[in-house]
Design a protein with these regions (language model features):
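Positively charged n-region of N-terminal signal peptides that target proteins for export
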Residues: 1-5
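Cleavable N-terminal signal peptides
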Residues: 6-7, 17
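Extracytoplasmic copper-binding redox domains, predominantly the cupredoxin/blue-copper superfamily
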Residues: 17-107
Length: 107
C-alpha cells in the first residue's frame, strides 16, 4: 500500500517533461516569450503558438534541432530538446526580419 501511495504521489507531483514554456506570438506581438532561456543539457523547450500564425523555430547551424514546419493554429505546440552545452540562436523563419529571435543557453 505504501508503494502504491508513493507511486501515485510521484505521478501526481511529476513535473512536465520540458524545462520551459515559450509562447510564440505572445501578447499579439511577433516575439518569443521568453526570448532568452537557460536550461541544462538534455532538457526540452515547449513552444506554443499563442497567436498570429504561422510560426516555426529554426536553430542556427543546427537543422537537426529545428522545427521548420509552420504552426498555423493557435495552441499548436511542439518540443525541442537541446542535448549539448552551448549557446543556440533561434528564430521564426517568417518573422525573423521583424525581430522574432531568441537564444538558448545550455549549461
Amino acid at each position: 500500500m505504501k508503494f502504491l501511495f508513493t507511486l501515485l504521489a510521484t505521478l501526481f507531483f511529476a513535473l512536465p517533461v520540458w524545462a520551459v514554456d515559450v509562447q510564440m506570438g505572445a501578447n499579439g506581438n511577433l516575439v518569443f516569450e521568453p526570448s532568452e532561456i537557460n536550461i541544462a543539457p538534455g532538457e526540452s523547450i515547449h513552444f506554443v503558438n499563442n497567436m498570429l500564425p504561422p510560426h516555426n523555430v529554426v536553430v542556427e547551424d543546427h537543422p537537426e534541432l529545428s522545427h521548420t514546419d509552420l504552426a498555423f493554429a493557435p495552441g499548436e505546440e511542439f518540443d525541442i530538446a537541446f542535448p549539448d552545452e552551448g549557446d543556440y540562436t533561434f528564430w521564426c523563419d517568417p518573422h525573423k526580419g521583424a525581430g522574432m529571435i531568441g537564444i538558448v543557453h545550455v549549461s
